[in-house]
Amino acid sequence: MANVVVVGAQWGDEGKGKIVDWLSEQADIVVRFQGGHNAGHTLVIDGVTYKLALLPSGVVRGGKLSVIGNGVVVDPWHLIDEIERIKAQGVDVSPSSLRIADNATLILPLHRELDHFRETANAGLKIGTTKRGIGPAYEDKVGRRAIRVVDLADPDALPAKIERVLTHHNALRRGLGIDEVNAEALLSELKAIAPKILPFADTVWSLLDEERRAGKRILFEGAQGALLDVDHGTYPFVTSSNIVAAQAATGSGLGPGAIGYVLGIAKAYTTRVGEGPFPTELFDEIGETIGSRGREFGVNTGRKRRCGWFDAVLVRQTVRTSGIHGIALTKLDILDGFEEIRVCTGYMLDGQPVDHLPASQAAQARIEPVYEVIPGWSETTAGARSWADLPAQAIKYVRRIEELIGAPVALLSTSPERDDTILMHNPFED
């Protein structure tokens, strides 16, 4: 029996929500291990739509333990709002079903303000952040001045911790021409939110270790995509955390031996939100058609996603950096009806072939994709639940992707409906 890590194999928005929901039925515990509330996802269960950003997907299924690990940065005000919202939809969320790592870093209002100011300022590089304070909170974590969940339990020690945070932030704000943060006001806000958050706090690494030893199945739910990883993504157009599968261990407190099967999620084409390189981006009617059919707008932000052909070079790269065992290929039905489909199989850089995306930002801007043209199919794949339901050419497309990325397709999704899934290999049965 394997524990399973789910990671996005592109730039996020690959359809992880549906796959995680499908897998969570077989899991006992669902763990978020990185990021914050910057990456939303939608679940449709028994006709009811749930929109989550910070809460693990398991929270909407009864009998599951949901865990927010130490690798996540937690906006406590957003978390309570999200809990109340899904409670209003009839979902039971209590300390018996949700635990939060006591050593998780908190996102403070000053982090959101700084994020917004940086991104909207005329000077400097625009990264395309969601302006929710994720990056500044991680900066404080690495700078060893963060306020963590556990600190809320010691109100007498909070003033000194706030002073340490504000020594840095108020100096920065003065330099940026922003009003300084009032220490008493921040202390009051934290004291007010503490009793709502602390009942969920736990020593998560110990809890997960005990459950693992008891034979419980653990599903590690990644957010965003590996191409946004702060180390292995298209830097600096990345998020502020590690996203690759190894982070599941670091961000939950379990050793790497607890990770079993790594399932990467990839669309049958490619999308990206925000700034940054995108070698296969389409600026024509085909790109518009893909975006319209695929409803390519952000769950949290409503931002329009950039669309392009499937980039086998990039997915092959994430297969390697995340140690992906198998891929869940989603949105195959969006490609129905195209006479021909292109797949990027390599790059040219200054007239020379390259088999990966270089780390240099300047080199990334000069990359030219090399395409293989594959005949399309006129029949529909929407709603297919077996190989027999698929057009022959669609099967050839999937098989060619497997060859190019160096990993098998374990699951194939043919619509947003959770049952419209073709299973080749169950990750939990490794």
Curated annotation (Swiss-Prot):
The keyword Magnesium applies. Its EC number is 6.3.4.4. The active site is at residues 13, 41. It is an enzyme of class 6 (ligase). Binds 1 Mg(2+) ion per subunit. GTP binds at residues 12-18, 40-42, 305, 331-333, 413-415. InterPro entries: Adenylosuccin_syn_GTP-bd (IPR018220), Adenylosuccin_syn_Lys_AS (IPR033128), Adenylosuccinate_synth_dom1 (IPR042109), Adenylosuccinate_synth_dom2 (IPR042110), Adenylosuccinate_synth_dom3 (IPR042111), Adenylosuccinate_synthetase (IPR001114), P-loop_NTPase (IPR027417). GO terms for molecular function: adenylosuccinate synthase activity; GTP binding; magnesium ion binding. GO terms for cellular component: cytoplasm. GO terms for biological process: 'de novo' AMP biosynthetic process; IMP metabolic process. It comes from the Bacteria. Substrate binds at residues 299-305. Keywords: Cytoplasm, GTP-binding, Ligase, Magnesium, Metal-binding, Nucleotide-binding, Purine biosynthesis. Its cofactor is Mg(2+). Its main location: cytoplasm. NCBIfam families: PRK01117.1 (NF002223), purA (TIGR00184). Belongs to the adenylosuccinate synthetase family. PANTHER family: ADENYLOSUCCINATE SYNTHETASE (PTHR11846:SF0). Plays an important role in the de novo pathway of purine nucleotide biosynthesis. Catalyzes the first committed step in the biosynthesis of AMP from IMP. This is Adenylosuccinate synthetase.
